[in-house]
């Protein structure tokens, strides 16, 4: 049975002594003693990781801390995971969290006095300090931050402390915790949790995105030139936004038929847009030059997905431009990026064997001890003992950023053993730049999830996994900004229609439940596949962009019967990227499951890729 505990996951260096904790909230103690840190120290991660100090303070009169929720028993506890708490301390922490969630401070205080292992005391204190029923003072908050600035609740405690800061009070230790990020890998890498400026950063990103979508390019550049924008987002993210805005401006010019002169200094995305415009006009020489600029972009300015796309299309454009000597070299360069869409297509076209190393790091004794000896890893192991998997994943993800490869391997091994595929993918993405130094990286990036659809699979596992990996990164609690739910990111209206028309056996089911969500998702996939003659490109595009948009693109895109040109011409960035990533996921999961990849053969031969059921023991598509 789930026990939901509101608060910023519990935590406290400012916990009061047992007798003081027994006092009522209306009569708080004068000054709480500091709880001791666990004996373990962090050796896997670089010491003293800098934390940016916020420059914008929230308004005191309106600040309310956004307290996360910790759930105990939200997942079965895996019996043979490494542990750090004995049974007595584990059960005592459970009672403390439950008592504090109910505002039973005296009962919680009595249990706190008996705690021997201090591993989760940071969580206990944060639960109290962030409770709406507890008037935390500035000195308490400052003391907690001094002990636990690396804690997941540190950003919320920091913001609350800023709002309650008094003249002459102790200096605050900035929060150093780096949490989950959203967006493309390049934008995610540029972002950190910046404490007080996080709301301002989110507002700026929303404004910039609206300007890009509405054609307000000049206004966007003016906003990016402001010092306050650079202070809030940081110079790296500002440069990424400049590239994105310039690309959108060039796209608008291309759609109006304006030819943009070749510039070496253009961002790769901008050259890509101009190259595709030249290709569709039939100017293969210009297209080849542009695609070569994309392929030759330095790795710090372009992802492996961009580089492989530039190389693949440079090969194709050069062949059509009468430069056959450049075809094979650029195609081989595309194939170097083995898990990308164009990398896989290039490998297939060259007749190369697609054989990633699927072995995942084993959680042996050495790696278990490494986690126990790390401050973050120790907290995560204790949380897993309580069944608090979401909180544990936050800790492990944060601890793996910029970590030693051996520590990352330990986290990936734990994710595999604890059946946490979402953690595995997120940790892998966070360590993409050092992937060649991490054993079992490819296997960790494409985990086999532990869930099954209610009633079993009616669509191949590889395709369902491919959509899940892209839609939610295997996070069953994922919710998009527009309300899409769960593993398959179903919109509420879509879930209702699918449940009533195509999956009546799921009537009354909870769409957040993994098995129900997967059942509804695969039923929707089956409907989409049936509507486009099993065309995988149009199915993926319809799942993300909507079937109506697919019908419009079929009528307006100048792609003929060229599936690769069709994909590259999809006007919505998100949908274009989605199609490529889902298909790449699908093919890689087929390889991992020991299945052939007929749709990859088809697209490499410039034919439309079509779904062919291969999980014969799992049934066939409805």
Residue ranges of each PLM-predicted region?
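Alpha-helical segment of the N-proximal tetratricopeptide repeat
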Residues: 90-104, 194, 198-219, 248, ...
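TPR/TPR-like alpha-solenoid signature
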Residues: 93, 126, 159, 205, ...
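Residue at a conserved register position within TPR or TPR-like alpha-solenoid repeats
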Residues: 99, 132, 165, 211, ...
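Compositionally biased, proline/threonine/alanine/serine-rich low-complexity intrinsically disordered stretches
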Residues: 21-89, 170-201, 210-214, 232, ...
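Structural motif corresponding to the intra-repeat A-B loop/turn of tetratricopeptide repeats
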Residues: 102, 131, 214, 249-252, ...
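Catalytic glycan-binding domains that act on GlcNAc-containing polysaccharides
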Residues: 118, 126-128, 135-151, 160, ...
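N-terminal signal peptide c-region/cleavage motif recognized by signal peptidases
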Residues: 17-19
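Solenoid-like repeat scaffolds
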Residues: 78-85, 109-119, 130-133, 143-151, ...
